C-alpha cells in the first residue's frame, strides 16, 4: 500500500535557515464520491486522497463504503473543518470523540484542522471565521490544539486561513501568531498557498513576505486550490477561496518557489464545488507532481555533489 510518510529527509547543503528539504513526496486530490469509479479505474499512482472528517462521522452507510474502497488502494488525509479551534469556548467533546474515532478507524497519514472558529454558544456557522491575533486568543488556540493532539495521539497540522477582514484588536501578525502556536504545541503546519495569495491580495500585503515569516521547517502538507474574483462595494478586487476552479498561475508560482526552498512536500489539490470530470482534477495533481519531480532531480544532484 502507498504511504505518504515515505519521504527522504535530506539537509540542504549549505542551508543556513534550518529548513529541511524532502524528496519523493506524494501529490493527492480531494476525494469526491462522484469520482470513485474513475479513481479506481485510473487514479493517482503513489498519490493520496483527502476527505473532510465531518462527512464521515456517521457509523456507516454509503459514505464509509466509498471511503473504505479508496483506503484499500490509497493513503488518506483527514481534514477537519468544524472543530472551531479558534473559538473562545470549549471544544465540542462529542465532535472531538468522533474525530478521534475516524483517525483510529482509517489511520490517515495526515490529520489537519483550520485556524478558524465556526461555533459559539451552541450556534454553528457554515463558514470558517477569522479570529483576532491576541495573547488571549493564542492561549485558547494552543489549549484546543493540545486537547486534539492528546485525543488523537499524534501531531495535528494547522492550516493558515484565507481572510477578508482583519481585527483592529490584534496585537500579533498572523505569521507571529502561527509561529507561536507551533512553538507552544508542537503541531505542524498545513500551508495553503491559495489562502496565502487570497489574503495577500485582499489585505494588500506581500505573499512572499508572509511566507518568510512562517516556520517553514514545520510544513507537513501543502494545499493548492482555485479562487474566484469579485468586487467589493468600492469596486476593489476581492478574491474568494472558492475551491471551484483550476489553480491560478500566481499560486503555481508560489508553489514552485516554495518547493525549491523546502523541498518536495505532500501536496493536495482541493476542488470542492463545480466539480470537473476526474481527468481534469487528475491533471492538476500531475502538474504539481511535475514540479516536485523537477525538484527531486535538483535535490538528487545537490546530494550527489555534496558527497
Curated annotation (Swiss-Prot):
Gene3D superfamilies: Divalent-metal-dependent TIM barrel enzymes (3.20.20.150). HAMAP family: UPF0276. PANTHER family: UPF0276 PROTEIN HI_1600. Belongs to the UPF0276 family. This is UPF0276 protein Bphyt_5128. It comes from Paraburkholderia phytofirmans (strain DSM 17436 / LMG 22146 / PsJN) (Burkholderia phytofirmans).
Amino acid at each position: 500500500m502507498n504511504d505518504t510518510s515515505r519521504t527522504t529527509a535530506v539537509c540542504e547543503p549549505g542551508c543556513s535557515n534550518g529548513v529541511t528539504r524532502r524528496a519523493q513526496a506524494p501529490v493527492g486530490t480531494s476525494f469526491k464520491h462522484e469520482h470513485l469509479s474513475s479513481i479506481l479505474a485510473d487514479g493517482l499512482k503513489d498519490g493520496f486522497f483527502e476527505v473532510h472528517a465531518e462527512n464521515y462521522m456517521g457509523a456507516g452507510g454509503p459514505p464509509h463504503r466509498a471511503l473504505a474502497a479508496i483506503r484499500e488502494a490509497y493513503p488518506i488525509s483527514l481534514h477537519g473543518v468544524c472543530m472551531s479551534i479558534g473559538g473562545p469556548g470549549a471544544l465540542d467533546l462529542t465532535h472531538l470523540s468522533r474525530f478521534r474515532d475516524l483517525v483510529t478507524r482509517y489511520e490517515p497519514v495526515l490529520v489537519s484542522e483550520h485556524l478558524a472558529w465556526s461555533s459559539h454558544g451552541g450556534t454553528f456557522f457554515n463558514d470558517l471565521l477569522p479570529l483576532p491575533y491576541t495573547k488571549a486568543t493564542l492561549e485558547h488556540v494552543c489549549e484546543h490544539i493540545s486537547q486534539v493532539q492528546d485525543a488523537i495521539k499524534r501531531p495535528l497540522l494547522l492550516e493558515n486561513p484565507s481572510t477578508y477582514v482583519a481585527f483592529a484588536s490584534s496585537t500579533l501578525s498572523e505569521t507571529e501568531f502561527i509561529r507561536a502556536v507551533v512553538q507552544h504545541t508542537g503541531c505542524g503546519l498545513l500551508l495553503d498557498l491559495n489562502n496565502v495569495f487570497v489574503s495577500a491580495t485582499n489585505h494588500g500585503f506581500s505573499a512572499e513576505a508572509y511566507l518568510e515569516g512562517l516556520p517553514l521547517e514545520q510544513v507537513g502538507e501543502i494545499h493548492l486550490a482555485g479562487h474566484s474574483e469579485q468586487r467589493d462595494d468600492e469596486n476593489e478586487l476581492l478574491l474568494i477561496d472558492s475551491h471551484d476552479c483550476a489553480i491560478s498561475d500566481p499560486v503555481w508560482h508560489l508553489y514552485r518557489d516554495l518547493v525549491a526552498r523546502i523541498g518536495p512536500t505532500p501536496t493536495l489539490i482541493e476542488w470542492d464545488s463545480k466539480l470537473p470530470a476526474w481527468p481534469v482534477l487528475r491533471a492538476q495533481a500531475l502538474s504539481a507532481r511535475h514540479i516536485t519531480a523537477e525538484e527531486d532531480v535538483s535535490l538528487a544532484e545537490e546530494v550527489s555533489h555534496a558527497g
